[in-house]
């Protein structure tokens, strides 16, 4: 009898132990499917946000990279001179093709439109409302030149901003027989003064220059100033109507 009672007690304890393990514990609660789904969606949002931020940063970095393909070149005028820019920004011609002052960046800023920048000075060649050439620290509409191939395979550079209003004749970059720069409205495209032969040295990548208003730039000292940089002039036949007096 005692053995039977012991066996019964042992059996009862075993059954109670098995029932205890089979019963879900209060501390071990099942997580609701909706909660899991919310956590999953939250993780996805975090992942997509990080991917988007990374993509934006990558695009910003790409925008900062140079994207314009231009050339470093010398510009040989048919008059027998190389165009050069002195350290103070003054322009003229020289027969010496070994000096760094004759190196220019030809940067495409539009369809057959270029900016001409001195390699050593970093200054842009610009033409003002009276046809004078001057150096500009900032890239403005006066720094844009249309690049056209003439019938003799020389290249001519004309101002994108100024021309004769009555005839529509363009104003050109040019050197005279003494190697001095000429007023744009005095240069004819059929004359050797306007004919340049680019002699590329290397292909280079450039960042697109930021366009500034003409009035923002200040001409370098000792160089013929641009009247239109001091005051915005209303153009009439290539001449400013209102001039700003200088002292």
From Swiss-Prot:
It is found in: Nucleus. One of its GO terms (biological process) is chemical synaptic transmission. The keyword Nucleus applies. Residues 15-25 have a biased composition (Basic and acidic residues). CDD domains: beta-trefoil_FGF14. Brain and testis; widely distributed in the developing nervous system. In adult, high levels in the granular layer of the cerebellum, less in hippocampus and olfactory bulb. One of its GO terms (molecular function) is heparin binding. Residues 1-37, 216-247 are annotated as: Disordered. Keywords: Growth factor, Nucleus. It comes from the Eukaryota. GO terms for cellular component: cytosol; nucleus; synapse. Interacts with SCN8A. Belongs to the heparin-binding growth factors family. PANTHER family: FIBROBLAST GROWTH FACTOR. Probably involved in nervous system development and function. This is Fibroblast growth factor 14. The gene is Fgf14.
